[in-house]
Amino acid sequence: MFNLKKQPSDKLFVPFITAGDPLPEISIELAKSLQEAGASALELGVPYSDPLADGPVIQRASKRALDNDMNIVKAIRLGGEMKKNGVHIPIILFTYYNPVLQLDTDHFFALLRQNQLDGLLVPDLPFEESVYLQQQCKKHGITYISLVAPTSESRIQKITQQAEGFVYCVSSLGVTGVRNEFEDSVSSFIRSVKGMSSVPVAVGFGISSSKQVEMMNELADGVVVGSALVRKIEELKDELVAPETREQALKAFEAYAKTFSGSYMVK
């Protein structure tokens, strides 16, 4: 299990990538680039054929990964390869619930432990239905990351009271994706979550520019960035796949990732 130290001058930067997009071995290099760019932790997404919470950018990434035969077991093992290849920041498996159900629970958590994965985030599992999975995470030393969306104060309080690692604060309802602006109500919602949470609060769903990062960092402890980074991978995929241009493409990706970065310390 992991915790994030709150240091006033530092901000949390949690990037998301899809396992196996564009290729598994490149995912490892992308993870290392994100670590170099200042990532506090990494969300490693398991590609899924029916990703209800994801917009078109991540849907396309899932399709590319699935076309390369990526699945939940291979994604977990890919996380283990990242650890063996110098990724020391926490790796959080981001997966829909159905792939977890298809594995025996003991087998699933044994795989997470064997591959030194640190956390689990299940976006389509409502808080009220997550008790069993949270208990299993505690039993196996895995940090369960909770999502909180705009809802009643009493429900926010229930979610934040049991939160571990950090709270993933959903900036807007609907699917993930790049957004140019956020509703005015987001500010009061984030302040409300932050006021109730004993762990850092990171805002995600739609963060796509350094200006938005600055705005969210004033309200919360940091940001989760997915679609913007996955879109950059999509733009660079041909250069990433070709050995002769890979190093240059990784440098371009790292430079782009740094525009979202803080320097939150992990303990």
From Swiss-Prot:
It is an enzyme of class 4 (lyase). InterPro entries: Aldolase_TIM (IPR013785), RibuloseP-bd_barrel (IPR011060), Trp_synthase_alpha_AS (IPR018204), Trp_synthase_suA (IPR002028). Disulfide bonds: none annotated. The keyword Ion transport does not apply. SUPFAM superfamilies: Ribulose-phoshate binding barrel. Keywords: Amino-acid biosynthesis, Aromatic amino acid biosynthesis, Lyase, Tryptophan biosynthesis. Tetramer of two alpha and two beta chains. NCBIfam families: trpA (TIGR00262). The alpha subunit is responsible for the aldol cleavage of indoleglycerol phosphate to indole and glyceraldehyde 3-phosphate. This is Tryptophan synthase alpha chain. It comes from Bacillus licheniformis (strain ATCC 14580 / DSM 13 / JCM 2505 / CCUG 7422 / NBRC 12200 / NCIMB 9375 / NCTC 10341 / NRRL NRS-1264 / Gibson 46). The lineage of its organism: Bacteria, Bacillati, Bacillota, Bacilli, Bacillales. The gene is trpA.
